[in-house]
Amino acid sequence: MYLSEIKLWNFRKYGIKDGVAFDKAAPALDVHFHNGVNVLIGENDSGKTTIIDAIRYVLHTKSGEPIYIDEKDFYKSKETNSQRTRQLKIECFFDGINDDDAALFLEWLGVKNTGDGKKNFILKVCLSAKRMDDGRIIPHFYAGIGGEGNSMSYEARNYLNVVYLKPLRDALQDMTHGYKSRLAQILQAHSVFSDSNKDSDGKHQLETDYNNLKAKVDGYFNKDGKQDGGKITKALNTTLTEKFLLQSDNKNAVIQLTGSELSDILRQLDLVMEDNKSGLGSLNLLCMAAELLLFSEKMRGLKLTLVEELEAHLHPQLQLRLIDYLESKGEYGQFILTTHSITLGSTIPLKKLLILKDEEVFPMDEDATCCTEFDYRFLQRFLDATKANLFFAKGLILVEGDAENLLIPTIAKIIGKDLHEYGVSIVNVGSTAYKRYVNIFRRKDKKHFNMPISIITDLDVRSIEYYEDPDNKGRKEVYRVTEETKKDLNAYKD
């Protein structure tokens, strides 16, 4: 089971066409995904986070952090004095539903014909919201193929929860003890700490062991006890009663381990890699490893992991190792990643990329581009990190070799048209295989990529080769062929 499509109406930057009634409007954005790894790639503010957040708003996350629609989620036109829209809607469609998954969502499923005589289950869930005059926002979640659908039970909706790794992760805070510890949320969502692993009294083994330890620690500091810790507690209470508290106050201070419930225990835990303080890169890997615990745990229902800015705090070699791991896990579930890393852009197979540009999403698979299978193979070999900046450019100049690569930026700067100021990238193809790169931007759906592309090559005139022959020893008689001499030659045919 995987997320195959998402549609947006009036969500953030994706607004429907003016003058069209909301209930009759086509979606402002329609994105198709495939099972396995999908990578949203594009420049800053191109809409990557908007798509990820839309998925989170509808499906919620496995860790259970609160997610609310606010006023700024409603589309606002860039025109002067425009107002935010009153309604928004997000629809998610799911495909690849097997019989086990179908049993979880039976009353909300639909059926579609595949064209080969077979039928597949499909599931649609929708989140809509209205913004009221008094500032309230009224959300409505429903599921089903036709019309407004039906409400979905809390239990069924939990099977659609996703694993989410947020951008610019504060890995140190997330993996450190505290009331808002992300590590505690992850552990509590793990099956090891589910109700099925508790005894008849509703106690987990960890709670029992912790409470035994707590009794010993608390006893050590008991003011009525005979251990050294009791002397400290007794001295504290003596100071309080004799120096600070009123005579009528009847209070005692104690030193103890706090909390006895499982949630309290998990909030006291840290995830560390080594005794010394780790760098941001190592902490980030720890954070992702912890988050992916939930991915491997979730056996039934949707297995979807959202990762924003996979490259955060990681050097290129670790980025490559991480993406290799995620690709290896792709057959067991779905990953939707965002990035603006040229390292990842050049490493991930082109078919798995979705380029975001100008309120549009351009899939790079064979159903969308004019690339042939040979083009894909060629680009997988030769589209390296120095060429992958074409995914982020406002304009593109493809050049044949090093000479053009050096001269063109210099000439542009001399005439006052610095290419960097205009977001124009130069890609040194290193050959005459321009068409393979251009086919990335040629679309079968005829959508315009809205990016000017130029191809600059040289004439490649061969230099005249000669050698000295003063004695004319190498002279050869050459018969010049013209229209007239052709007639003479034809006369000698047998």
Task: State where each predicted segment sits.
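Electropositive, glycine-dotted interaction segments
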Residues: 89-91, 97-208
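Short glycine-/polar-rich loops that comprise or flank the Walker A/P-loop
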Residues: 85-90, 121-125, 158-162, 301-302, ...
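Conserved catalytic network of the ASCE P-loop NTPase/AAA+ motor domain
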Residues: 32-33, 43, 80-86, 116-120, ...
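Conserved P-loop NTP-binding catalytic core
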Residues: 52-116
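Acidic, divalent-metal-binding catalytic cores of TOPRIM
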Residues: 354-494
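Conserved nucleotide-binding/hydrolysis micro-motifs of P-loop NTPases
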Residues: 13, 94-100, 131-134, 169-172, ...
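Extended helical coiled-coil dimerization/tether regions that scaffold
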Residues: 2, 174-178, 186-304, 328
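Switch/communication elements of ASCE P-loop NTPase nucleotide-binding domains
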Residues: 1-60, 264-388, 396, 405-406
